[in-house]
Amino acid sequence: ERPDVELWVLCRPEAAYFLWRLGKRQPKQEGQLRSDVCAVAAFFAHCGAKNAAILGCTGSALPAAVKASGVRALTCICPDRATARLIENKVSGTRAYEGSSGYTDLADASQSTVLMYLPVKAEKTERLESDLRNALFETRRVLEPEGRIVVIAALHHAESTLRKTQGVRVLGRYPLTLSGQKSAIWVMETTPVNDEA
């Protein structure tokens, strides 16, 4: 028979330490990615000593993980100026600026990897789907041939759009739960549009 939690806290000497550790956790901002998800996404990105970009960057955890993977140059396109400043201050050697994920100042075929994060708490709207389509179009423009795309998003936000996108081939889809919603990490690579089936 298992004792209830209150009895365990009263009786066990390690309970005080457990409660102290529980209270010490930093509350995450809404829409922030967990560090383990960021590490997995950075691993799938296979950046190496090349250039990478993050579209729709809302926090510093993903840029820090990608930078730690040994990327040469990292560019983050953020939805607001405050996030861009935060990333530049926390992740050294990273270029971050406010802008649209669908229209960047990156040169054609200049990136080996592009990562995208769609916050899972956002409501699915026509605008969200349109923004994702524009971001994927921009991604194909800035990626070098056979470049890699990593998308982190809720299934209901991105699955149908990613399936219909031309010029990319899905290498793998890895399910996970983010903020209580079914989500996934999609790993894709660019292909010539005429090679598609």
Name the predicted role of every residue range.
Residues 1-28:
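Non-catalytic substrate-recognition/targeting regions of SAM-dependent transferases
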Residues 48-58:
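Conserved class I S-adenosyl-L-methionine
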Residues 92-101:
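Conserved SAM-binding strand-loop segment of SAM-dependent methyltransferases
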Residues 148-197:
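C-terminal catalytic and target-recognition region of SAM-dependent MTase-like enzymes
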